Amino acid sequence: MAALLGVNIDHVATLRQARGTRYPDPVSAALVCEQAGAEGITLHLREDRRHIQDDDVRRMRPLLKTRMNLELAVTDEMIAFAKEIQPQHVCFVPERRQEVTTEGGLDVVGQFEKVKAATQTLAAVGCDVSLFIDADLAQIDAAIACGAPTIELHTGAYADAETEEQQQAELQRIIEGVEYAASKGLVVNAGHGLNLDNITPIAAIPQIHELNIGHSIIADSVFVGLAQAVQHMKAAIQAAR
């Protein structure tokens, strides 16, 4: 069975915010993605609100027919917002104001008690909590100890590798992380920097449950349309196994 496709629609909002307009509407984009075959919709409400806005999340939540995967920093403000919205899934991610995009995995080891408390708080209101981490065994063990049922492994280093040797080394690290986490009973997702050129080796890993992909799909949609861009990525994922 192929991995599921979660489409991240953040960069529809990026395009809107670039001009301060009301269009394009990320809620409308999410519905198109669902109709095109996406099995979930991912969006990141950043502390600086650089793309997705609170109102986007509120409007989208009751309209989705699949699942909302809301990415958030581990802060009191964001935890309170998630308790209000109650998305099916919450993925805790690291966040730095000066970064262009999320640059690495969450350091669960270094802020264990904080992450554990946040995980338990949202689990108590019915959210399936995942932690966006690097494929590092210590971080995976910490995620387990937090009580998170799901992790999402950061594929950025694989996607950004400049040589074939580097990419293969990163792929092997991801495979080992996936296999270890799955052997411990975790649901394992993956994402960041994935596109049609590099998706196949990741999508071929049998234990990966879902792949969350955004920027490359939105970029491809400029040329082929959003529905077709989603379908192209879904076809590539399905062909990998």
UniProtKB/Swiss-Prot annotation:
- Alphabetized SUPFAM superfamilies for the sequence: Pyridoxine 5'-phosphate synthase
Output the Gene Ontology cellular-component terms: cytosol
Protein name according to UniProt: Pyridoxine 5'-phosphate synthase
Q: What is its EC number?
A: 2.6.99.2
Write down the top EC class of this protein: transferase
InterPro entries linked to this entry? Aldolase_TIM, PyrdxlP_synth_PdxJ, Pyridoxine-5'_phos_synth
Annotated site (Transition state stabilizer): E152
Subunit info here reads:
Homooctamer; tetramer of dimers.
Catalysed reactions, as listed in the record: 3-amino-2-oxopropyl phosphate + 1-deoxy-D-xylulose 5-phosphate = pyridoxine 5'-phosphate + phosphate + 2 H2O + H(+)
Q: Which residues bind 1-deoxy-D-xylulose 5-phosphate?
A: D10, H11, R46, H51, T101
The molecular function GO annotations come to: pyridoxine 5'-phosphate synthase activity
Which Pfam family is one of this chain's hits? PdxJ
**Protein task:** Catalyzes the complicated ring closure reaction between the two acyclic compounds 1-deoxy-D-xylulose-5-phosphate (DXP) and 3-amino-2-oxopropyl phosphate (1-amino-acetone-3-phosphate or AAP) to form pyridoxine 5'-phosphate (PNP) and inorganic phosphate.
Tell me which UniProt keywords the record has, alphabetically.
Cytoplasm, Pyridoxine biosynthesis, Transferase
Q: Where is the active site?
A: H44, E71, H192
GO BP annotations of the record are: pyridoxine biosynthetic process
